[in-house]
């Protein structure tokens, strides 16, 4: 990672582990394994995809919102800093992210990448592929997103990462095992639905992911994770309703309620198969009262604390 971890700030209630918050816990136990944050401040893919820029400020906004969250006395959390992102050099930035992810996996940590646009996902995947953790194992990619992000384009964008991952899986002779929760029908063309079907992608529409469907959503996740050996979770904040997440590159017209998304995060965070997560598309320029940053922080916190309740190394 090219830049060291920024200074964290937040509320302080007193000394001692019973008063721990993220800002005081970060990098407190450098030798211990735990959850390790990596910032990827890029909106290059969003701009290439015709979206509204601003997601490069996402990592800082998530850290700021996370700083005062209370944390369990025994939880181990690290901040590995930000990957360098320069100009329009997306591919070089993704390569840098891959190196950072592979390094954290090699150290026995659970990397959690803070985006950045959803072009983050391909860099995350490359790091997992380089780590050796996929050797002889079946990878499952679970995406919480209003979009399939399976576009075919001349160059990488925020709309192409899972098409690129499909190619990467084919290259290593593996099946592309990909599921999306929260697909918005009006936001995906018939061609994208056809591509998803051809690639064997499982999905749930946003219409079928409302509060009353939470048990069905949980069952969908359980069925998906049962079929894989290693799990990678990617969250695009545009999966949430625009009222709960206005500060994203492409706000949702319906969305999956935060309560349902949190249930998925708890379930996946508790799964020993989870080895990598990222959260993307926070665009602070369009946020209202830090609403989106705070819900993003809550999702990161939920997964990190769920993972802390088990051994991060279990199941590797």
Locate predicted features.
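Conserved alpha-helical scaffold segments that buttress catalytic/binding sites
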Residues: 2-316
């Amino acid at each position: 990672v090219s830049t060291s971890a920024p200074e964290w700030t937040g509320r302080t209630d007193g000394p001692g582990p019973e008063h721990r918050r993220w800002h005081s816990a970060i990098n407190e136990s450098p030798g211990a394994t735990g959850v390790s944050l990596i910032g990827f401040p890029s909106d290059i893919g969003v701009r290439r995809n015709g979206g509204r820029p601003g997601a490069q400020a996402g990592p800082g906004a998530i850290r700021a919102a996370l700083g005062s969250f209370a944390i369990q006395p025994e939880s181990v959390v690290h901040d590995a800093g930000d990957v360098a992102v320069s100009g329009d050099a997306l591919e070089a930035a993704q390569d840098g992210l891959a190196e950072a992810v592979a390094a954290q996996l090699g150290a026995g940590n659970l990397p959690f990448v803070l985006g950045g646009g959803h072009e983050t996902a391909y860099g995350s995947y490359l790091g997992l592929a380089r780590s050796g953790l996929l050797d002889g194992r079946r990878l499952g990619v679970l995406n919480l997103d209003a979009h399939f992000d399976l576009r075919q384009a001349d160059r990488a964008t925020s709309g192409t990462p899972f098409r690129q991952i499909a190619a990467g899986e084919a290259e290593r002779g593996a099946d592309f095992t990909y599921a999306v929760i929260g697909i918005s029908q009006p936001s995906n063309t018939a061609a994208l639905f056809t591509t998803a079907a051809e690639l064997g992608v499982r999905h749930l529409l946003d219409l079928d992911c409302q509060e009353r469907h939470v048990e069905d959503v949980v069952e969908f996740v359980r069925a998906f994770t049962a079929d894989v050996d290693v799990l990678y979770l990617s969250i695009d904040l545009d999966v949430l309703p625009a009222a709960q997440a206005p500060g994203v590159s492409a706000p949702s017209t319906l969305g999956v309620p935060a309560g349902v998304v949190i249930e998925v995060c708890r379930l996946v965070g508790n799964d020993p198969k989870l080895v990598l997560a990222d959260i993307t598309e926070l665009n602070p320029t369009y946020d209202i009262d830090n609403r989106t940053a705070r819900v993003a922080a809550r999702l990161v916190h939920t997964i990190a604390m769920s993972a802390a309740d088990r051994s991060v190394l279990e199941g590797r």
